[in-house]
């Protein structure tokens, strides 16, 4: 499904690509996989490693990212009209051909686990980690931490195959919605 709101007063296009799922769809024993997988999408895609991907995005003046929420996964692109085609190509690579390079997985795991440790010492973080299990019960899809970060043990145990598999199951065009707002037309988006 494509939803388009044409706004031609500013030469910018914003895209929001939403997939069903989110961290309520994390498989048993893998809390955090939805958000972690989404967080790695812009760490290299297609022929570009993480540094090359980010450099190209900056050259184009595009902001590209991805994340997961309770009931959805999503990716966003904000691009200048004059650089829309190459920005969309980079965005498409991120969505269709994420690299999941092991060195990036390891680097992001370290950052992620540090973030989980931070959550555990902040009152709001503790609440986001503890309340869902108390309200819905451990094992319920909504019983995982509301931050979507999972647990240290689960994140440490994730493999590249886990991430590739999750991406192939949950982050595909079938059933997805693309919302586009900005200085473009449907003909430009779907030639």
Q: Across the structure, where does each feature detected by a protein language model lie?
A:
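Short, intrinsically disordered, charge-balanced linker/junction segments flanking boundaries
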Residues: 1, 29, 188-191
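Short, surface-exposed beta-strand/loop micro-motifs that present aromatic residues
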Residues: 1-6, 165-169
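M16 family metallopeptidases and their MPP-like homologs
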Residues: 3-5, 9-42, 48-96, 109, ...
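Short amphipathic beta-strand starts and helix->beta connectors
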Residues: 57-63, 157-166
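Peptidyl-prolyl cis-trans isomerase
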Residues: 97-100, 105, 158-160
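Non-catalytic, conformational "gating/processing" segments within enzyme and secreted inhibitor domains
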Residues: 124, 160-191
